[in-house]
Curated annotation (Swiss-Prot), chains A, B:
CDD domains: PSAT_like. It comes from Desulfosudis oleivorans (strain DSM 6200 / JCM 39069 / Hxd3) (Desulfococcus oleovorans). It holds the Pfam family Aminotran_5. Pathway: Amino-acid biosynthesis; L-serine biosynthesis; L-serine from 3-phospho-D-glycerate: step 2/3; Cofactor biosynthesis; pyridoxine 5'-phosphate biosynthesis; pyridoxine 5'-phosphate from D-erythrose 4-phosphate: step 3/5. The modification N6-(pyridoxal phosphate)lysine is found at residue 196. Keywords: Amino-acid biosynthesis, Aminotransferase, Cytoplasm, Pyridoxal phosphate, Pyridoxine biosynthesis, Serine biosynthesis, Transferase. This is Phosphoserine aminotransferase. Its cofactor is pyridoxal 5'-phosphate. Its main location: cytoplasm. Gene3D superfamilies: Aspartate Aminotransferase, domain 1, Type I PLP-dependent aspartate aminotransferase-like (Major domain). HAMAP family: SerC_aminotrans_5. L-glutamate binds at residue 43.
Length: 361, 361
């Protein structure tokens, strides 16, 4: 038997055990090919079946049709900070960015490096990004409105998306992709590094509306143009086959074991509530995000002192509860509870937290 | 028992069985962490140990010191076609490119997309790239000389590298990286998509000399600047952890099981000779590359008719010899025999080829 911990890492993060077991079982001989999935050609029928299945599952989960393309792009979400404006922000136009934390700040920085014009439509920097801004000063002529739907480090999440009066929303959903249903009619493009909710690190999923693709900027290097990926089903060059295979298995788990995004959302709400209720009932644990901006994915909290926080993380680790340290830029504690974190994991954490408060409070 | 075939795919390609077995055995619990390697944080001690080990092994294998950086970059070799000139070709300078096939042609195309100046120093296009050019018209002021060391599709390889009078060579070594010793003093940068000689698809290894890094172009998006990777040990953002782990195991195999690049080279020469000797002794099988330009990695050949080639590939497949079809752009047959292809695999192929000639010749 392998030892398994409850893994609260922010990403790379826990994956469903059944997915890991299937990868392991088939690792030397994938689908009767006599090859590992790491050895199969990306120009083969077995791999075509995988990538097509993944695309179909994403579309079905999100309820989108042929007006969107689902792309697999390397370079992580960080590469998208540059690719989004390269492709979607034409010269002479500007884009609105809402600054809700570290990742939004980086998205803005990369856009400016390209010499493009950014309008910061709102920011919550005044209170260390502890909330999602309510008032946005949007430019009706903006090429797009960029939003970080879930702020992994600050522990905040957009509960609803704003009405942008027809300007397409571009959203970094790295830390909450496929964790809840979405009204996709509001979005022009969403992107997400795989390594939190949908698979191992090594690919970024980009879902883009055809009309944006059609008017995208031209003259880009092939690997930096969305069109290259859209025209080739992400097979212009060798894709990260193993990672896409693992993602396909996670998507299958999401559809067939969980039962889709409504069900996933309900479970995620229940999981997060167990922790937030504990904070609200205790003076020992305190959440860092405003109540109306709390993330269902990254639950950030503080203990009465940094010493206690250090001991908390250490003792949790000894109890096989891993990854609870807050991001180095903010300190404190953080429990990342993405789709694959089970209710049992949350329950184990809650039990540990109560015991730790009893003995240290 | 898993079924295993002899896999002659051009990439993704065969990996050493012992590497696959180790990944499989540790897949649910990596190094006692209680997590899969796909779930381990890239900011953790266990992952640091992996990436540092990989870098150290590459340097030891190639006999290079701290004057080079070993980087892991996403996007495959195709992304390097653009990143090389973005970083290393300053405005007002030009670069020399030797055109030896499909991949060189693409490298040239991407450089031109960027509006940069290319001098084609030589080309073997006149005879469908069946040879490596001997005469190069090099520009002493070029920023670099770009060479595709092994032409995966055309089956040709540079046996030696030219004297470029101090101008650094930049080489796409996707299909022969770490297959033989190199005199690294000639090179400013080498790059290789992992999926042929060193691991699964999903990362490109870039080995670059510090002096080129120091004078590299600035003002690039973070993910497109080599400096970003060099300054962060390839951990600026989330790297493809699983792929880097697999590469580290392949490097360990290369050092500890094979015994380094001299040994690997000797084995590779022996393997290729078995096939080329067969061609030379037979009028049924004929190599497509000039004798002095033959690749030790991708052995391209023709049979007397396309019908026979089709039957050859089909019957080979039935005999568990996979991936022998030539690239769709050239036809014919191709046996890709990278580092991980065993002598037993070559012997099985040679036996099959003799039998096929006997019954169809
Ligand atoms: C919201 C968000 N955006 C972007 C990133 C950067 O992702 P990557 O490491 O894939 O570039 C992260 C990583 O944690 C994130 O949480
Ligand atoms: C020599 C060479 N260069 C570049 C490439 C493209 O590599 P990638 O698919 O990693 O972009 C290949 C792929 O076969 C290749 O053989
Ligand atoms: Mg954040
Ligand atoms: Mg409280
Ligand atoms: Mg070629
Ligand atoms: Mg012959």
């Amino acid at each position: 038997m392998s030892k398994r911990i409850y893994n609260f890492n922010p990403g790379p993060a826990a994956l469903p055990l059944s997915v890991l077991e299937e990868i392991q079982a088939t690792f030397l001989d994938f689908a009767g090919t006599g090859m590992s999935i790491t050895e199969v050609s990306h120009r083969s029928k077995p791999f075509d079946a995988i990538i097509n299945d993944a695309v179909t599952r994403v579309k079905r989960l999100l309820g989108i049709g042929d007006d969107f393309k689902v792309l697999f792009v390397q370079g992580g979400a960080s590469m998208q900070f540059a690719m989004v404006p390269m492709n979607l922000l034409p010269d002479g136009k500007s884009a609105d960015y809402v600054n809700t934390g570290t990742w939004s700040t980086k998205a803005i920085k990369e856009t400016k490096i390209l010499g493009k014009t950014v309008n910061v439509a709102a920011s919550s920097e005044d209170r260390n990004f502890a909330y999602i801004p309510k008032e946005l000063s949007l430019d009706p002529n903006a090429a797009y409105v960029h939003i970080t739907s879930n702020n992994t480090i600050k522990g905040t999440q957009w509960a609803d998306f704003p009405d942008t009066k027809g300007v397409p929303i571009v959203s970094d959903m790295s830390s909450d992709i496929l964790s809840r249903p979405l009204d996709m009619s509001k979005f022009g493009l969403i992107y997400a590094g795989a390594q939190k909710n949908i698979g191992p690190a090594g690919v970024c999923m980009v879902i883009v509306k055809n009309d944006l693709l059609e008017k995208a900027n031209t003259g880009l290097p092939s690997m930096l143009a969305y069109k290259t990926y859209a025209d080739s089903n992400s097979l212009y060059n060798t894709p990260p086959c193993f990672t896409i295979y693992a993602i396909d298995l996670v998507l299958k788990w999401l559809e067939e074991t969980i039962g889709g995004l409504e069900k996933m959302d309900a479970v995620n709400r229940e999981k997060a509530a167990l922790l937030y209720d504990l904070f609200d009932a205790s003076s020992f644990y305190n959440g860092t995000a405003d109540a109306d901006s709390r993330s269902l994915m990254n639950v950030t909290f503080r203990l009465p002192s940094e010493d206690l926080e250090k001991r908390f993380v250490e003792e949790a680790t000894k109890n096989d509860l891993g990854g609870l340290k807050g991001h180095r830029s903010v300190g404190g504690c953080r429990a990342s509870i993405y789709n694959a974190m089970s209710m049992e994991g949350i329950q184990a954490l809650v039990d540990f937290m109560k015991e730790f408060e009893r003995t240290n409070g």
